[in-house]
Amino acid sequence: MAKYINYSYEQLNKFCTDAFKKFGFNDEQCKIIVDVLLTSDLYGIESHGMQRLVRYHKGIEKGLIKVGAEPEVVFETPISAVIEGNEGMGQLLGHKAMTMAIEKAKVSGVGIVSVRNSNHYGIAGYYAKMACKEGLIGMSTTNSEAIMVPTFGKKAMLGSNPIAVAMPAEPYDFFFDASTTVVTRGKLEVYNKLQKPLPEGWALDKNGHGTSDAPDVLANIVAKAGGGIMPLGGASEVSGSHKGYGYGM
């Protein structure tokens, strides 16, 4: 039985900030990274919140995430830009990209900025809401490692590839943020930590059969051994699996 302990936002903010400072990020960088993570937790998206700390730390130790990476704008027009991320922290690159997009949109009416050679950037919706707070329509999408098993497939071929949209509206802003898979890898990590079986219809084992074994699915994803997470819509075109597969493409 999982045991839960409650901590205040202030406690978690300090803990995460101290951790990322230990990782080598400066104060301003820590503020951005931690805000993205804790915003996710406040929204109830625990899969993309501070539970990612361990995975980020491992990424830094392995050199997959470059703490001192300096992003470079390698292409730019009045309405668009491409940023070379140099394998930096995803949250910092996502924040920089949306900041540039907002600036361009305010001048030209539209701003489109893409990032290459980045890392996991947290919830896509955070960046869409950055634009919404400025009175603009914001969109944010990203690819990821292969975790989605295409309709009728056995092996993960596509990422969770989320789509997020935020726009000003009355009485409340419109906000949508969803992966194109049934769930994300992060959700499987949460179930694994809680030692809970996965609900039916979430994942496939390496033989293409439905499974509730979170540790096994995660291990297969890492090893690229087959299996993975189902597309939005599940396993069959009858339930709309082809739609999640198509959105992911």
Give the residues covered by each predicted segment.
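Short, well-structured alpha-helical segments
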Residues: 27-38
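N-terminal and secondary-structure boundary signal
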Residues: 21-24, 39-46
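A generic, well-ordered mixed alpha/beta core segment in the N-terminal half of proteins
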Residues: 82-170
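Residues forming anionic-ligand binding surfaces in small-molecule and nucleic-acid pockets
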Residues: 74-84, 95-111, 208-231
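Active-site cofactor/substrate anionic-group-binding motifs, chiefly glycine-
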Residues: 49-102
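Generic N-terminal amphipathic, Lys/Arg-enriched alpha-helix
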Residues: 1-23
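Internal helical hairpin/lid segments
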Residues: 225-249
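Phosphate/diphosphate-binding glycine-rich loops and adjacent basic-rich segments that engage nucleotide
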Residues: 148-222
